[in-house]
Curated annotation (Swiss-Prot):
Quaternary structure note: Monomer. Part of the FGAM synthase complex composed of 1 PurL, 1 PurQ and 2 PurS subunits.
Keyword line: ATP-binding, Cytoplasm, Ligase, Magnesium, Metal-binding, Nucleotide-binding, Purine biosynthesis
GO cellular component: cytoplasm
Binding-site positions, substrate: 99-102, 121, 245, 317-319, 535
A GO term for molecular function: ATP binding
TM region positions: none
Reported function: Part of the phosphoribosylformylglycinamidine synthase complex involved in the purines biosynthetic pathway. Catalyzes the ATP-dependent conversion of formylglycinamide ribonucleotide (FGAR) and glutamine to yield formylglycinamidine ribonucleotide (FGAM) and glutamate. The FGAM synthase complex is composed of three subunits. PurQ produces an ammonia molecule by converting glutamine to glutamate. PurL transfers the ammonia molecule to FGAR to form FGAM in an ATP-dependent manner.
UniProt GO BP: 'de novo' IMP biosynthetic process
CDD domains for this protein: PurL_repeat1, PurL_repeat2
Positions annotated to bind Mg(2+) 1: 98, 533
Residues annotated to bind Mg(2+) 2: 122, 273
Protein name (record): Phosphoribosylformylglycinamidine synthase subunit PurL
EC number in record: 6.3.5.3
Length: 728
């Protein structure tokens, strides 16, 4: 019998070794109460990952309960690997967003690559074929070498995995701000399509049913990855490089295809990806959802090397693995399938009726834990928050140089073209991509139909820091507008909540207020939350990131035919829809001129968002519009310049605003370009100019901005290239 040298239960207690795993004294005591004895080394490791912030949401769960999660189209909401929403004709869209922030800070290529791989497996575990990838990325300012290195590595990792596995990257966002120095945000989203009768759940039930492991052999990579993702980054974080998982997209592709075949077998009982906390979370969660027990015989787990202990097996986050429960007597059918795809697989245990999570190795018991308390009784913390205090600041915007300001904003990497990154992603694999990255939302045809899925992934930070409640509403509305801009009906959303240490009162209050705003917007815009992720402790040496909720939203296009002519032409009329107010607090103009965030009472009208959005969407479907863009960062001035640069053509517009108000970021506004001869009936729409002129010209109440189109386009397209040409 193999002997593993591990601390005893007494040594764990006396030396408080559980603290190194992320458990507090009170949490350790709760484990003792649940077990009725002191836990051994494997057991305390299991509790530490299952009760980590990453797996248990112990600081955010009360806020997540505010979100509306049901609707007439929602087939499956939070609690499974991903959300499932009906799109008609017995089909559904499956989607989720996940974070891989901490791993990407330490090992950017693998951190990003495994983030993509993990979210793909979440979608596949439901039984859906992935059709879209999206990503939301944030780094420190691109003038710094370290940020260039992180950016380069993350983009390469996303492309390296996504391109190999054969899923197009269709949309996303990339921003740069000093608040993300040392703590980049890497959020990945995947969207898939499934028939209703193929939807799977991660459940283990049926006494005696075998448990099958399939995928890469288990190694020591990623041990305590979930715990690592639940703590602040520090100078010691580099030593935790082994906590970063290693991806293998070629095995990932084979696993995806094998899984999609396995879900067609009626003998499949349940399936779940081995993601955060690996074999521990997948097996214990499946047992909990099935109201069953589970017994794993760990000597049967395929391992990469000899001598891997039960503790290491259970906490490893080796990638490209799935766990299945199948009907007793049919296991060989599944093993033969996986052998056909040249994947390692084995029966490693069985479902029991004991309600216990039991782990043995060659007959020796290494863990015996009640299932429900492990899965469902993680502590939940309700803390005292405190609103951040802002000094009263009244910045003077009266004497800006509009032309110089426009060029500076347009060429800042946050607002410049992201083609440097998108060109490294396969955008067309599968031949169903209709709208590629770079515009409001990605659009992908549903194969064999006239339908299409529009998807967007949007985050907000400076406004959430400025006013968390209103900022929370804004991030949901931004995603809604981006889907409206391609004529789709917004259906539902997934969220990724990226914040600092929730044990700090101001950050806890940011989380509380912003999620309240998000929940209100979800209700008003009829976009229920069907899946999501929380990433807390995003701090470096005690400095927190801006609170950054990220929203992934999907929309339905019933008939893609209108998209054939959805493009602007020379002579089309440009309309501005909305109104401009002197809203500068949290804006990119404020950042450019003063490099800070001043508190303002910026607000959003959700009722108006719905009315305006519906009107614009109907105009697109009716073929009256050639292009639509929601006005966002940089205001109407930057948005018009981006449109001109994207199409490399001039435009002329006259606006009843001051020079500074060209860059005000008043919420709810759009630029729409109407086709010649088409009547526009949108409340708040005003004709402001013409598309397709020789030069780029904006007139304000104070003067005129005139720019050479080629110069402007080169500045917009070349900004990130210029930063990345130096050796990184």
């Amino acid at each position: 019998m193999v002997k593993f040298l591990e601390p005893t239960a007494n040594e764990i207690k006396e030396n408080k070794l559980y603290q190194d795993m992320g458990l507090s004294d009170k949490e350790y005591d709760k484990v003792v109460d649940i077990l009725g004895r002191m836990p051994n080394y494997t057991e305390i490791g299991i509790f530490s990952v299952m009760w980590s912030e990453h797996c248990s949401y112990k600081h955010s769960k009360p806020f997540l309960k505010q979100f509306p999660t049901t609707g007439e189209r929602v087939l499956m909401g939070p609690g499974e690997g991903a959300g499932v929403v009906d799109i008609g004709d017995n089909q559904a869209v499956v989607f989720k967003v996940e974070s891989h922030n901490h791993p990407s800070a330490i090992e950017p290529y693998q951190g990003a690559a495994t983030g993509v791989g993990g979210i793909v497996r979440d979608i596949v575990s439901i039984g859906a074929r992935p059709i879209q990838l999206l990503n939301s990325l944030r780094f420190g300012e691109l003038t710094e070498k370290q940020n260039q290195r992180l950016f380069k590595g993350v983009v390469a990792g996303i492309g390296g995995y996504g391109n190999c596995i054969g899923i197009p990257t269709v949309a996303g966002e990339i921003e740069f701000d000093r608040q993300y120095e040392g703590n980049p945000l890497v959020n990945a989203m995947c969207v898939g399509i499934i028939d209703h009768d193929k939807i799977q759940k991660g459940t283990a039930k049926g006494e005696g049913n075998p448990v099958i492991y399939v995928g890469l052999k288990t190694g020591r990579d990623g041990i305590h990855g979930a715990t690592f993702a639940s703590e602040e980054l520090s100078e010691e974080s580099e030593s935790k490089r082994p906590s970063v998982q290693i991806g293998d997209p070629f095995v990932g592709k084979k696993l995806m295809e094998a899984t999609l075949k396995a879900i067609t077998f009626p003998e499949l009982v349940g399936i779940q990806d081995m993601g955060a906390a690996g074999l521990t979370s997948s097996s214990s969660e499946m047992a909990a959802k099935g109201g069953s027990g589970i017994h794993l015989e760990l000597e049967k787990v395929p391992t990469r090397e000899a001598g891997i202990s039960p503790y290491e097996m259970m906490l490893s986050e080796t990638q490209e693995r799935m766990l299945l429960v199948v009907e007793k007597g049919t296991e060989q059918k599944f093993l033969d399938l996986f052998d056909h795809y040249e994947l390692d697989s084995a029966v490693i245990g069985q479902v029991t009726d004991t309600d216990r999570f039991v782990l043995t190795y060659e007959g020796e018991v290494f863990a015996d834990i009640p299932v429900q308390p492990l899965s469902d009784e993680a502590p939940v913390y309700i803390l005292e928050g405190r609103a951040a205090q802002f000094d009263a600041v009244n910045h003077d915007y009266s004497n800006i140089d509009a032309q110089d300001t426009l060029m500076k904003l347009l060429s800042h990497p946050t607002m410049a073209s992201k083609n440097w990154a998108y060109s490294q992603y396969d955008q067309q694999v599968g031949a169903n991509t209709i709208i590629k990255p770079g515009l409001s939302a990605g659009v992908t045809r549903v194969e064999g139909t006239k339908k299409a899925i529009a998807a967007t992934l949007d985050g907000e930070a400076r406004y959430v820091f400025n006013n968390p409640y209103e900022g929370g509403k804004m991030v949901v509305a931004e995603a809604y507008r981006n889907l409206i801009s391609v004529g789709s009906l917004p259906l539902a959303m997934t969220d990724c909540l990226n914040y600092g240490n929730p044990e700090k009162p101001e950050i806890y209050q940011q989380l509380a207020d912003s999620t309240r705003g998000m929940a209100e917007a979800c209700g008003a815009l009829n976009t229920p939350v069907v899946s999501g992720n929380v990433s807390l402790y995003n701090e470096t040496k005690g400095d927190a990131i801006f609170p950054t909720p990220v929203v992934g939203m999907v929309g339905l296009i019933e008939d893609v035919d209108y998209l054939v002519d959805f493009k602007p032409s020379k002579g089309d009329t440009i309309y501005f829809v909305g109104e401009v107010k002197p809203d500068f607090g949290g804006s990119q103009l404020e950042k450019l001129l003063f490099n800070e965030v001043a508190h303002t009472d910026v607000a959003i009208d959700l009722e108006q968002e719905v009315a305006r959005g519906e009107a614009i969407r109907q105009h697109i479907i009716d073929g009256k519009l050639g292009h639509v863009q929601a006005v966002g960062k940089g205001g109407v001035g930057v948005k018009l310049a981006q449109i001109a640069a994207y199409f490399n053509t001039g435009l002329e517009a006259q606006l009843d605003v001051s020079d500074a108000e060209l860059f005000a970021e008043t919420q709810g506004n759009y630029i729409v370009i109407a086709k010649q001869g088409k009547e526009i009936d949108i409340d708040g729409a005003e004709a402001i100019g013409t598309f397709g002129t020789e030069s780029f010209k904006l007139s304000t109440n104070q003067g005129e901005v005139t720019l050479d189109v080629n110069r402007m386009t080169e500045a917009w397209k070349g900004a990130i290239h210029a930063c990345m040409t130096s050796e990184v």
